[in-house]
């Protein structure tokens, strides 16, 4: 059966029953149909005095077209924890329509380890992304309107930093000229679109503590600069309060369930290669009050998602992870060892051992944050006993345990061994989490620290304009912010073709952007785009409705 067929055949409980298991009354749920609901802000506020559970991060090796199954493992681990008698919840991000119709075709787990309703989660869900897109574009409209009606703030139209967004992969919108067509349409200027998941509004929603914090952060957004080079904020044109109104319900986390009827919070969705890649702080904090173990994921490999989870989300939200799981597959490590995708079905122990250095690098990096690590081998049918043994031997040689997991085929029953070991690791109290760098380190030094200690770069370079911009950010009072490096997800380097564990390479920072509301500085490297394009054969070509009105093609 395909993922969508498995999801459609699931025996789901009414969302009110899932809520009751967590102690949430029907009055504190805002249902969207029978199988999904938002949790009220008043209920979340009532949890503040409860003790926190243990926070467990699921991350992965660098992703390849062979697939790693990070979300699948995150969901499966929660099902496994509940099977062994633990009270566990999963916290994951909402999928973006862009990749759904581009290359992914869906993102809610897979096989017997999914969150449901899978179709709804992938397509519109509860409307959060629409609200974020609307709030972002309201600010864009108010900027141009402010200029049209006299430009009281003296905005320099050459230095407006706020673009528009849409939740779609559309390369034609990357760069454009707006306000053409004459005087009545405003002042023409260069602008463009980013994808919604790259929006600072998305990052703000995912890092805000509550509605008051959300409004404060929205007001701090730097929309551009005056002709005297001083910053103009969203609050200066009185946009932040109306933006908050649009985001009021989007701030409430979404409650759904796994295939095994365990509670899941699916909320927020910033990308990890062009943003910070973690689900919302509101959802994570709520789950920590409602469960003994909370399993969350961070996007792409540990060099991107895990680093940003630790250095941005945990730092800013005061979270202290108790354990980390790194997902690896035999197939992906063979690809890192030089095997072509078409040959991955054939046994090749030597290639696996060559590629395993990628896993070793990630293990070493996560340990550098003071968080204990275990490896989950996400099983594929083509894996041979010799390959699995070689991977486990390699893991043992670097002092980490690698547990074979069959959750894709067997659900929670196939991951119980990992669940027991992760629970014991989290309960041991050996975690001593520390971010990679202090707040008071200069911004460029923070970029260098991440590049050299996590990516293992030999040098970090930047044009004079980038250095000057960072100096300006520091002069404006933003020098204590963490950095969020936009980089390819496929390699430790900025070259997606450099697989394995390259070192000594150069990281060139070609642009920096201030996300004052979110609370970080974005450094853009390589060819990373904040508006992706569709591939030659987009997944949208095979997504359709069948004769019964059911969706086909999501996977």
Curated annotation (Swiss-Prot):
Top-level taxonomic group: Bacteria
EC number of this enzyme: 6.3.4.3
Assigned keywords, A-Z: ATP-binding, Ligase, Nucleotide-binding, One-carbon metabolism
Reaction it catalyzes: (6S)-5,6,7,8-tetrahydrofolate + formate + ATP = (6R)-10-formyltetrahydrofolate + ADP + phosphate
GO molecular function, one term: formate-tetrahydrofolate ligase activity
Pathway: One-carbon metabolism; tetrahydrofolate interconversion
Claim: Zinc is one of the keywords in the record: no
Chain residues that bind ATP: 64-71
Matches recorded under Pfam families: FTHFS
Example GO BP: tetrahydrofolate interconversion
Entry-linked InterPro entries: Formate_THF_ligase, Formate_THF_ligase_CS, P-loop_NTPase
NCBIfam families: PRK13505.1
Family: Belongs to the formate--tetrahydrofolate ligase family.
This protein's name: Formate--tetrahydrofolate ligase
Organism: Allorhizobium ampelinum (strain ATCC BAA-846 / DSM 112012 / S4) (Agrobacterium vitis (strain S4))
Lineage: Bacteria, Pseudomonadati, Pseudomonadota, Alphaproteobacteria, Hyphomicrobiales
């Amino acid at each position: 059966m395909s993922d969508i067929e498995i999801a459609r055949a699931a025996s789901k409980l009414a969302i009110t029953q899932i809520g009751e298991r967590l102690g949430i009354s029907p009055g504190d749920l805002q249902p969207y149909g029978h199988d999904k609901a938002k949790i009220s802000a008043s209920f979340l506020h009532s949890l503040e005095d409860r003790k926190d559970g243990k926070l467990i991060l699921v991350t992965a090796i660098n992703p390849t077209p062979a697939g790693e199954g990070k979300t699948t493992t995150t969901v499966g681990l929660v099902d496994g924890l509940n099977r062994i008698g633990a009270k566990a919840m999963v916290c994951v991000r909402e999928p973006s329509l862009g990749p759904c119709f581009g290359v992914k075709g869906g993102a809610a787990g897979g096989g017997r380890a999914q969150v449901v309703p899978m179709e709804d989660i992938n397509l519109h869900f509860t409307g959060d992304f629409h609200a974020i897109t609307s709030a972002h574009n309201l600010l864009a409209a108010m900027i141009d309107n402010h200029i049209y009606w006299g430009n009281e703030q003296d905005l320099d139209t050459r230095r407006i930093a706020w673009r528009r967004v849409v939740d779609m992969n559309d390369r034609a919108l990357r760069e454009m000229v707006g306000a053409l067509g004459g005087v009545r349409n405003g002042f023409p200027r260069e602008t463009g679109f980013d994808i919604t998941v790259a929006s600072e509004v998305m990052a703000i929603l995912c890092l805000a503590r509550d509605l008051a914090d959300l409004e404060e952060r929205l007001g701090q957004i730097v929309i551009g600069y005056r002709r005297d080079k001083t910053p103009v904020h969203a609050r200066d044109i009185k946009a932040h309060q109306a933006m908050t109104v649009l985001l009021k319900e989007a701030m409430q986390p979404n409650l759904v369930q796994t295939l095994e009827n365990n509670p899941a919070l699916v909320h927020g969705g910033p990308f990890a290669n062009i943003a910070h890649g973690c689900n919302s702080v509101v959802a994570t904090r709520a789950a920590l009050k409602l469960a003994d173990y909370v399993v969350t994921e961070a996007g792409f490999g540990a060099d991107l998602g895990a680093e940003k989870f630790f250095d941005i989300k945990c730092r800013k939200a005061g979270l202290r992870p108790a354990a980390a799981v790194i997902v690896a597959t035999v197939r992906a490590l063979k690809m890192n060892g030089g095997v072509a995708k078409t040959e991955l079905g054939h046994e090749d122990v030597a290639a696996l051992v060559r590629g395993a250095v990628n896993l070793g690098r990630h293990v070493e990096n996560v340990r550098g944050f003071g968080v204990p690590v275990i490896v989950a081998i996400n099983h594929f049918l083509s894996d041979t006993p010799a390959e699995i043994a070689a991977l486990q031997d390699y893991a043992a040689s670097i002092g980490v345990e690698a547990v074979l997991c069959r959750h894709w085929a067997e659900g929670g029953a196939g991951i119980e061994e990992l669940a027991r070991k992760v629970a014991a690791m989290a309960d041991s109290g050996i975690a001593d989490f520390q971010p990679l760098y202090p707040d008071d380190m200069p911004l460029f030094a923070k970029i260098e620290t991440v590049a050299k200690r996590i990516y293992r770069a030999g040098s970090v370079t930047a044009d004079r304009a980038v250095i000057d911009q960072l100096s300006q950010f520091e002069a404006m009072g933003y020098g204590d912010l963490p950095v969020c490096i936009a980089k390819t997800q496929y390699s430790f380097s900025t070259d997606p073709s450099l697989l394995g564990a390259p070192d000594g390479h150069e990281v060139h920072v070609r642009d920096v952007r201030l996300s004052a509301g979110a609370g970080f500085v974005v450094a853009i490297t390589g060819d990373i785009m904040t508006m992706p394009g569709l591939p030659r054969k987009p997944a949208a070509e095979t997504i359709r409705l069948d004769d019964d009105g059911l969706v086909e093609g999501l996977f």
